[in-house]
Amino acid sequence: LQKSVVNSRALELIKVPFSLNGIQEDEDGVITGILEHEANAYAKNKIMNLYTFEEKCSMIRDYINQKILPMGVTTVVAIETSLIREREDYQKFLKFIKKLPVNIELYYSITDTDEIKARKMKRMGGDIGVDGSFTSRNAALFENYEDVDGNGDLYFSQEELNRLVLECYEASLQIGLHAVGDRAFEQVLSAHEYAQAICPGTDLRHRGEHAELLSFDQIKRAKKLNLVLSMQPVFETLLGNTQKGLYEGCNELYVESLGERHLRTNMFRQILDEGIVICAGSDSALTPVNPLLGI
C-alpha cells in the first residue's frame, strides 16, 4: 500500500523520524497523519515488528486456509520484507513454507543484491517501488492527473535504477520492479535497455509489476527486452468500471484520475498480441484472491 493514515497517538507510538521523506503537512506546517514513501515504509515495518515471527506465520496459515485454498489457487508469489529481514527468520520461513498446502515462490523486496546472493536466492524485488499508485495519485505519469495537481512521483533517479538493474544482470538475478504509470515504466525500460547493452544475451524473465498505463511504443520495447508483465486484470473491473453497481466496491478511479487516458489502461489484448507473457495476479490483499474474476 502506498499511503498510511495514522492519528496522533499512532505517530507517537511509531516515532517516525521527521527526516524521512513522505510526512505530509498542511499549509501551516502541521503534520496531517498521512504518510507516504519512506515514512510509510517505516511505519508499516514498525507495525509489523509488533508481531512475533510465530504470530506472522499463524496469520499466513489462516489466510491461506480461509482465502486462498477455497479459490482453487495452488501457487502463491509471496513478496516479503520485514518477515525475513533477519537471516535466522529467513531460514525458519523456508522450513515453514514447505509445510503449507500451497507452493510458495518467494521474493525478497529489497535493493541489496549482495544480501540476495548471500541467501542464494535467484530473484529479488517483486515490489521494489519505482512509483506509487493511482489510488494515492502518486503513480508517475508523463502528463498531470485529471483531478489533482502534479504527475506523481519517481522513487529512483534513472542512474540509481540503471545501477540496480545492471547489478541484477551481472549476478544473474531476476528482478521485479513496481511501475504503474507510463513515466515510471519508461524508467524501467531504460534501465533494462542500459543493462542489456552491457550484459547482452541474458534472459531471466525480468518482471514489470502492474504496468497499468503504457504507450504502444513501450509495449514494443518491453517485448524486445523480453520482459514478463505481472498484471492484475481485476483492477480494470474494480477501478475502470464505468457501469456503476455492476460489481460491489467498483468505481471509476481510472476515469477520475486519468480522463481520456483511461482508454489505454491495462491493454491486455495489445500486450498479448505483441507476444508478451502476462502473469495475471490479484495483488492481494489489495484485491481479493479470485482468478475467475480476473479472467
For every predicted segment, state its role.
Residues 7, 72, 132, 178, ...:
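Divalent metal-coordination and catalytic microenvironments
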Residues 197-266, 271, 291:
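C-terminal active-site-proximal or functional interface alpha/beta core segments in diverse enzymes
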Residues 1-111, 135-167, 171-180, 184, ...:
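Divalent metal-binding segments
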Residues 8, 88-90, 185-193, 239-247, ...:
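Histidine/acidic-residue-rich catalytic or RNA/ligand-binding cores of hydrolases
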Residues 96-97, 115-119, 166, 199-201, ...:
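Acidic (Asp/Glu)-rich catalytic clusters
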Residues 173-183, 230-233, 271-293:
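Short acidic/histidine-rich active-site segments
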Residues 119-123, 193, 221-230, 274-277:
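Glycine-enriched alpha-helix->loop->beta-strand junction motifs that scaffold or abut catalytic
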Residues 76-77, 104-109, 122-130, 175-177, ...:
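Hydrophobic faces of well-ordered beta-strands that scaffold small-molecule active sites
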